[in-house]
Structure formats: structure tokens, C-alpha cells
Design a protein with these regions (language model features):
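Acidic, glycine-enriched catalytic cores built around paired aspartates
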Residues: 151-153
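Metalloprotease/metallohydrolase-associated module, dominated by Zn2+-dependent proteases
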Residues: 145-147
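Active-site gating loops and adjacent loop-to-helix segments of metal-dependent hydrolytic enzymes
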Residues: 128-139
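Charged interaction scaffolds used for protein-protein
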Residues: 141-143
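Short, acidic/turn-prone active-site loops that include or flank metal/cofactor-
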Residues: 113-116
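Short acidic/histidine-rich active-site segments
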Residues: 89-93, 111
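Alpha/beta enzyme core
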Residues: 1-83, 95-109, 121-124, 129, ...
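Active-site neighborhood of phospho(di)ester-bond hydrolases with catalytic His/Asp-centered motifs
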Residues: 85-87
Length: 169
């Protein structure tokens, strides 16, 4: 029913299958792997994107993280065909794992935590340097600019890693 409503309004729909680890919107998951057959069932409903749990985690990764399950990702890709796959919890995943996930069909990678972290760090440095006390440095446009600039630089870095740099029309 939701797929029909979304299509009628020219929107896209992304489904998340399996438990993505970490905390997102107050829900805590352990990072289990999705069942590829369940992913196929959800894909067959007509969703536009599929985010399958493959050991990924929202937020920061713990030191004892086991890594992504490429076996699960390959099985999901095989069963769902050309459906674009999404990797939630992309922050902190090593570059070689990101590239392998892309090779196995991931076409969207969420890295919001990474953007939040660089924003907070740059804003903190601005305040700790006392720049908010100089002239009108307290102006939100000035106060938040270092953080916004840090996000821009992080996104550029990720676009190169993800292979999307220079592809916009």
C-alpha cells in the first residue's frame, strides 16, 4: 500500500531490512545480518532502494566490530538483481570495505555521523579559539560556518571515495 502511495506522488521509497546496529531515532540494534530471502520479498514489493543489515552500525563503530558480511551482501544482490542497495552506517567503515560494498551493488552510502562529527569538531575549535568573542563572531552565520565548511570538505572526500565525484549533470 505504501509503495502505491509513494509512486502516485512521484516519490521514492527505501526499505531497511534486518537490524542495523547502533542507535537511530531511539531504536537500538545489534547489527545482525538481514535474511537475503526477506530482502527479496521486500524488493518484490516495488521499493526503490534496499538497505540490508550486513553487520553495519549507525553511529560510531566499537573497537571489537567484526566488519561487514560480504557473503550476505552478495546473496542480497544476487536475489534482488538491479535494485540499488544502500549501506546505512557508513561512518567509520574502512575504505577497502566501502569499495568492495560498491563492487557488490551498493549505490548509496549514508555517512551522516561522520558529517556530524566534523561539524562538531570545527565548531568546537572556533569557540575554543575565542573567535565567537571577536567582533560579531557570535553571529550564527559566522559561528556555524567552520562546521558547515567541514561538512562540505568531508562530503567532497566521500564523493571521491564513493566514485560519484564529477558525475552530476
Amino acid at each position: 500500500e505504501l509503495v502505491k502511495i509513494v509512486k502516485e506522488h512521484g516519490m521514492s521509497l527505501e526499505a531497511e531490512v534486518g537490524s542495523i546496529g547502533g542507535e537511530e531515532d531511539g531504536v537500538v540494534g545489534m547489527g545482525e545480518c538481514a535474511d537475503p530471502k526477506e530482502c527479496k520479498m521486500i524488493a518484490d514489493l516495488g521499493v526503490d532502494f534496499l538497505a540490508a543489515g550486513i553487520g553495519n552500525i549507525h553511529g560510531k563503530y566499537p573497537a571489537n566490530w567484526k566488519g561487514l558480511s560480504f557473503e550476505t551482501l552478495a546473496a542480497v544482490q544476487e536475489l534482488t538483481g538491479e535494485l540499488p542497495l544502500v549501506l546505512h552506517g557508513g561512518t567509520g567503515i574502512p575504505d577497502d570495505m566501502i569499495k568492495k560494498a560498491i563492487d557488490l551493488g551498493v549505490s548509496k552510502i549514508n555517512v551522516n555521523t561522520e558529517c556530524q562529527l566534523v561539524f562538531a569538531e570545527a565548531t568546537r575549535k572556533y569557540i575554543e579559539a575565542g573567535k565567537d568573542l571577536e567582533g560579531k563572531g557570535y553571529d550564527p552565520r559566522k559561528l556555524l560556518k567552520p562546521g558547515a565548511d567541514a561538512i562540505v570538505e568531508k562530503v567532497k572526500e566521500k564523493m571521491i571515495l564513493f566514485g560519484s565525484d564529477g558525475k552530476a549533470e
